[in-house]
Amino acid sequence: MMQKLIAQIEKGKPFFEKLSRNIYLRAIRDGFISAMPVILFSSIFLLIAYVPNIFGFKWDKGMEAILMKPYNYTMGLVAFLVAGTTAKSLTDSFNRKLESTNQINFISTMLAAMCGFLFLASDPAKDGGFLSAFMGTKGLLTAFLSAFVTVIVYNFCVKRNITIKMPKEVPPNISQVFKDLIPFSAVIIILYALDLVIRNSFKSNVAEGILKLFEPLFTAADGWIGVTIIFGAFALFWFVGIHGPSIVEPAIAAITYANIEANFKLLQAGEHADKIITSGTQMFIVTFGGTGATLVVPFMFMWMTKSKRNKAIGRASVVPTFFGVNEPILFGAPLVLNPVFFIPFVLAPIVNVWIFKLFVEVLGMNSFSVNLPWTTPGPLGIIMGTGFGLWSFVLAITLIVVDIIIYYPFLKVYDSEILDEEEGRKESNSDLKEKVAANFDTKKADSILAASGVSDDAAKASNITEQTNVLVLCAGGGTSGLLANALNKAAEEYHVPVKAAAGGYGAHMDIMKEYQLIILAPQVASNYEDIKQDTDRLGIKLAKTQGAEYIKLTRDGQAALDFVQQQFEN
């Protein structure tokens, strides 16, 4: 029955893969990735300013203002910045479809989107200048609107050559300025017109109007059904091999970051921070140790199984999973597309967010009010992200216990299956050894090989003689680091001229020309056709990997080097 259910879900895989590659959703996701240094930097000052309050220490007003200035001048402008980074990402996607000699200038689209955003989100101040109330997280939806309109208008103009053309004698940089003038002007006029219409009709700016329009949706998303559907989708998509966050994250990005800001404001006012859907909820509650809430799973494989294979997989997966990189257990066990683990893989994240919601709404625990790096270990992320409250420690322990209870019966079933397989192979191998020993004497062959100096190291020789730079891409840069590290270690050990780097898909466009080979981790393998347009244009080799194959390469440096070599032989 479980196999039939998985087969039905897999029928929708092509549609969801296409959805994950949607250029607008990808632009939102990549726009946030580009702005992440700003988001994380600002959170440092929140922690310094307000965590001491828990221990009875409060900064004086002057010092608090000093500590909050970096936050207000960075996170307070995040929507303004995201308008530009989202426009840049969308421009890259449109440029793939345009001739290489007639490309959209991404710097110009970034500037136009940011200027257009100011028309839609800022109000004039009485003493000159403009107000910034909607330039932070409240203006994120408007930032996306500005970015999308900007790039669509630029694409329309550039594709149809609706630009000012200069004589060939004019330097290219000057010609580009005039080429951008018409689309830039068109964007500003369109967005300014929209601003005038909304202000005259509804007596508010566009950002405020959009926020009011989506407010019922934000409220519904924070409810029991909302969190179940949203966060259950993360695991459900990943289980059938589709990177769930690529689909779900862009759809809820504006809500998660707006709620973080709202929770912080509530805490500042001495009130209860009760917004459930936040970036912290996603990273440290729902994906507690990675998608599927797998923090406890490697430890369970290591300590609660009898199979040698399962114990080895657990040991190899513990460290990366502890830091949120759970592909070694996802594809090594495997958990994904494994009928035995379908129920716990989807159920554990949902139960986790239900428990968190109970802690917040019934026990009065504060929700997340600080953005932290996604690689922060789950328990530590819960404690730090919610302000070091007592309930956060209790919650972290509770989630660990509950997730063990959810996974345990299914793990025992799976371990029993693997044990039976191991026993079968053991008997088969024993019979085979006896037959070989009875019919062949390998001692003579072994002595000849030893005398000739043939060793394992000789077999590890590589045909790669020129410096080869390899870029490994995944969704966030964590999983890709596993393979990049394996390649670098093996290259150093066997003296092969290979250098590997890890990166996140979406942040690769400006650096890919420095590499001879790009390898896609399973998370982003569905983007193969899109990135191939770029690699073909630049003369770069491109390879994609499957789950178990990728994990094998991360654990076997020689195999990883062989994989690199094969890409240049094909």
Curated annotation (Swiss-Prot):
One of its GO terms (molecular function) is protein-N(PI)-phosphohistidine-lactose phosphotransferase system transporter activity. It is an enzyme of class 2 (transferase). It is a multi-pass membrane protein. It catalyses: lactose(out) + N(pros)-phospho-L-histidyl-[protein] = lactose 6-phosphate(in) + L-histidyl-[protein]. Keywords: Cell membrane, Kinase, Membrane, Phosphoprotein, Phosphotransferase system, Sugar transport, Transferase, Transmembrane, Transmembrane helix, Transport. Residues 9-410 form the PTS EIIC type-3 domain. Induction: Induced by lactose, galactose and galactose-6-P. Repressed by glucose. It holds the Pfam family PTS_IIB. SUPFAM superfamilies: PTS system IIB component-like. The chain crosses the membrane at residues 31-51, 65-85, 104-124, 133-153, 178-198, 223-243, 283-303, 340-360, 382-402. The keyword Phosphoprotein applies. Its EC number is 2.7.1.207. GO terms for biological process: carbohydrate derivative transport; phosphoenolpyruvate-dependent sugar phosphotransferase system. GO terms for cellular component: plasma membrane. The modification Phosphocysteine is found at C474. The active site is at C474 (phosphocysteine intermediate). It is found in: Cell membrane. The keyword Aminoacyl-tRNA synthetase does not apply. Residues 467-570 form the PTS EIIB type-3 domain. PANTHER family: PERMEASE IIC COMPONENT (PTHR33989:SF8), PTHR33989. The EIIC type-3 domain forms the PTS system translocation channel and contains the specific substrate-binding site. The phosphoenolpyruvate-dependent sugar phosphotransferase system (sugar PTS), a major carbohydrate active transport system, catalyzes the phosphorylation of incoming sugar substrates concomitantly with their translocation across the cell membrane. The enzyme II LacEF PTS system is involved in lactose transport. NCBIfam families: lac_pts_IIC, lacE, pts-lac. This is PTS system lactose-specific EIICB component. It comes from Staphylococcus aureus (strain COL). The gene is lacE.
